[in-house]
A protein has these predicted regions:
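Short basic helix-loop element that most often maps to the first helix and adjoining turn
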Residues: 5-24
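Conserved hydrophobic/aromatic packing and binding residues within compact polymer-binding modules
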Residues: 7, 21-22, 32-35, 61
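Short acidic/polar N-terminal linker immediately downstream of export determinants
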Residues: 13-14, 63-121, 150-154, 261-272
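Recognition helix of helix-turn-helix/homeodomain-like DNA-binding domains
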Residues: 27-41, 64-66
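DNA major-groove recognition helix of helix-turn-helix/homeodomain DNA-binding modules
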Residues: 45-60
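Right-handed parallel beta-helix
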Residues: 81-85, 89, 121-204, 216, ...
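Short, surface-exposed interaction patches in beta-rich subdomains
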Residues: 142, 200-293
Length: 293
């Protein structure tokens, strides 16, 4: 449950009306309403008052939001948070990284978490800059002290958490070995850069991937469009066995092939399916693979 759901749950469990709860912790009924519908967030003093009223810890009250952002097993880490007050488009520029996770979660803040088992000076060598410009948030990762992109590709792991209710369009630029995009529902996600492996799970979006490396793309679950743009590359796209999709190719000298149980087969796309795969580019090949059950 989200924080607002937790507050509602414990209030009802205690048999309290919003007005009665407000009296007990010394706030207005309107404050309780805002906390429960997600238009407001209690500060730390009020979180403590709520926890005390319901005889639970603040950690228990926040347990769901914390569980979505699991603790890392890395030696070094750095986290940057920023409060968001409404729906935003995101322009994210990361440069090089070993792995990047882009996730939606139930919370109020955007968080950029960096991990490494190598960088002792992670806090000094990498700085996250977040600019809030009207309806857009720019996130830039800057390197200092001669930290190189080559080093980042060897050992820097980045996880970006974006609040579910504030996600607009996303543009991500990154050069990474692996990229995971999870649980994002929005109009459009555009990915640019050099990426070797991509995993998509639980998304509802039009996802566009522009990369000229040979890629391994795994779709565990996805609703919407997937557009792949490549130049002189050969990539593989693995889909669940029961995944219905229609497909098309555009560009110059592009080809789509199909594979099942390790063998090339005829086109098994479905012209009536809602999910859509588009392959575009120049002198490139895409092999669509049906995952083995």
């Amino acid at each position: 449950m989200t924080l607002e759901e937790q507050i509602t749950h414990y209030r009802k469990q205690a048999g309290l009306s919003q007005e009665k709860m407000a009296e007990k912790i010394g706030v207005s009924r309107q404050a309780i309403t805002k906390w429960e519908n997600g238009t407001g967030t209690p500060d730390i003093a009020n979180l403590m008052a709520i926890a005390n009223l319901f005889q639970i810890s603040v950690d228990e009250l926040l347990s769901n939001e914390k569980s979505e952002k699991k603790q890392s097993n890395y030696i070094y880490e750095s986290r940057t948070e920023y409060d968001i007050d409404g729906k935003k488009n995101f322009d994210i520029k990361l440069g090089g990284a070993y792995a990047v996770d882009l996730k939606a979660y139930h919370g109020e803040k955007i968080e950029v978490a960096m991990f490494s088992n190598v960088y002792k000076n992670l806090l000094a060598d990498y700085k996250v800059k977040i600019d809030d410009i009207k309806n857009r948030i720019d996130i830039d990762l800057n390197r200092f002290n001669e930290a190189s992109e080559a080093d980042a590709k060897e050992s820097l792991v980045i996880t970006i958490f974006i609040p579910v209710k504030y996600i607009g369009k996303i543009e991500l630029s990154v050069n990474a070995g692996t990229l995971n995009i999870t649980d994002i529902e929005n109009e459009h996600i555009e990915v640019n850069g050099k990426i070797s492996e991509v995993t998509l799970q639980g998304n509802k979006s039009e996802i566009e991937i522009d990369s000229n490396l040979d890629m391994q793309i795994s779709v565990l679950s996805h609703e919407g469009a997937l557009e792949i743009n490549q130049l002189s590359a050969t990539s593989r796209l693995t889909l669940p066995a029961d995944y219905r999709f229609r497909s098309t190719k555009k560009g110059i000298a592009t080809h789509i092939y199909y594979e099942r149980q390790g063998k090339k087969v005829d086109d098994f796309s479905d012209a009536d399916a809602d999910n859509y795969i588009e392959f575009n580019g120049i002198k490139s090949e895409l092999v669509i693979v049906e995952a083995e059950v």
